[in-house]
């Protein structure tokens, strides 16, 4: 058992997953859970972001490491992106960090980036180093209780405990974007609503979320209580995260149906419950599955109305079409086709294009494309552009268009010329 007078260094390497975001000004939930474990064990620790670490001199880094008796880092950036206020830790930086750690202290690296690096052969040589491929927080908890490392998953009770303790942990109160009582910063608190994906049986081949299995929901009451604790220490802005699809929170038929039926009541209870706290300012959400919306228009309409009523203007529902090419859709088990996308876009536009108090549309879709998926051909990019032109001609609004390149092994090479032409055409003629 680890003594509680130890002092650990918790390094936030940031996470960027399909359903989790923790790059500033966002603070992710996995790093907070890690801090929640240390809070529960009453172990002293220091929280730093990777950007704060980068600004330290060699002398300052040596001094920090000299005083710690344990180290834990979350590296969860598996979705490539462009960032404004921070950059996730890289594999190279992680290797350098490991080489610089005192050899006698235990060190834990976790997050989906670590899992991906490990599968690609990343195996740093160091005594008492553990690369977690399950729940980093539960793995740390097991070590603190037994003194030995093994992969572990958190229970639902631990989930609640560490989420609530993490809400008031140093990952929040010492985050550089929290600001002061006199002048609050832009910190946005990403709260985990559920984990897993309703397409767990046959999800998108490039995505990590189906690998997490059948969705496990948190109750509205549990989430609301966690956010209240965060408000107590100065948090003002919240985004509902962890959801691969806002519309399938506590949906019906998740294990039986290809298109589970959205359940309007729980998400309404959660959103209205969060809004009852006057300390909450910005409230946004993340993902939506166009096929679920298109195949369940009636309950999806009710949920859309609730989102428009409770979310702050400027809210985005990320729609992962990825490709308009039926060939790519079939080979990669994508979650919606162009027809379903159009149906979902029409519904969101019908209610979400009204402008809020800041002058922004209340709720609009964001559209995601991924280049390099199997089955892609030269015509794929023409199909993508033609679809966007059809949406524009119909007068449907999008909040933004993300164009990314697939990460990982087992995918085909991207035709650079066609890809660049597509990106330029989108930015010049659609955006």
Where are these regions (language model features)?
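Short helix-loop-beta junction
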Residues: 32-45
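Catalytic cores of alpha/beta
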Residues: 118-125, 299-303, 373-391
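Canonical Radical SAM [4Fe-4S] cluster-binding loop centered on the CxxxCxxC motif
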Residues: 183-222
């Amino acid at each position: 058992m680890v003594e509680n007078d130890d002092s650990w260094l918790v390094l936030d390497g940031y996470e960027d997953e399909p359903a989790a975001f923790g790059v500033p000004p966002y603070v992710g939930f996995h790093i907070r859970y890690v801090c929640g474990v240390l809070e529960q064990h009453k172990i002293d620790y220091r929280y730093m972001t990777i950007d704060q670490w980068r600004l330290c001199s060699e002398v300052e880094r040596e001094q920090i490491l000299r005083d710690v008796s344990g180290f834990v880092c979350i590296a969860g950036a598996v979705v490539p992106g462009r960032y404004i206020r921070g950059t996730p830790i890289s594999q190279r930086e992680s290797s350098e960090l490991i080489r610089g750690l005192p050899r006698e202290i235990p060190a834990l690296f976790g997050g989906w980036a670590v899992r991906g690096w490990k599968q690609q052969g990343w195996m740093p040589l160091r005594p008492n180093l553990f690369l977690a491929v399950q729940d980093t927080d539960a793995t740390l908890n097991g070590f603190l209780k037994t003194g030995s490392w093994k992969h572990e998953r958190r229970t639902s009770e631990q989930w609640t405990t560490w989420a609530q303790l993490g809400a008031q942990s140093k990952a929040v109160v010492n985050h550089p974007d929290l600001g002061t009582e006199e002048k609050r910063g832009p910190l946005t608190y990403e709260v985990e609503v559920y984990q897993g994906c309703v397409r767990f049986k046959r999800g998108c081949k490039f995505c990590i979320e189906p690998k997490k299995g059948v969705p496990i929901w948190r109750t509205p009451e549990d989430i609301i209580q966690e956010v209240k604790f965060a408000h107590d220490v100065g948090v003002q802005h919240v985004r509902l995260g962890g959801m691969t699809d806002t519309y399938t929170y506590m949906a019906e038929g998740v294990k039986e149906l290809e298109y589970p039926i959205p359940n309007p009541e729980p998400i309404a209870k959660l959103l209205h419950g969060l809004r009852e706290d006057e300390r909450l300012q910005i409230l946004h959400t993340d993902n939506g599955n166009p096929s679920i919306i298109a195949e369940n228009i009636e309950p999806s309409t009710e949920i859309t109305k609730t989102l428009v009523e409770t979310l702050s203007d400027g809210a985005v529902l990320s729609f992962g079409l990825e490709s308009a090419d039926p060939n790519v859709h079939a080979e990669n088990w994508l979650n919606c086709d162009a027809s379903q996308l159009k149906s979902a876009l029409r519904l969101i536009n019908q209610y979400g294009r009204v402008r809020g108090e800041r002058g922004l549309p209340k709720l609009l879709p964001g559209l995601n494309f991924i280049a390099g998926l199997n089955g892609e051909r030269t015509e794929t990019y023409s199909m993508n552009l033609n679809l966007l032109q059809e949406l524009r001609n119909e007068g449907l609004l999008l909040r933004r268009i993300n164009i990314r390149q697939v990460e990982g092994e087992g995918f085909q090479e991207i035709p650079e010329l066609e890809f660049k032409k597509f990106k330029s055409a989108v930015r010049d003629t659609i955006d």
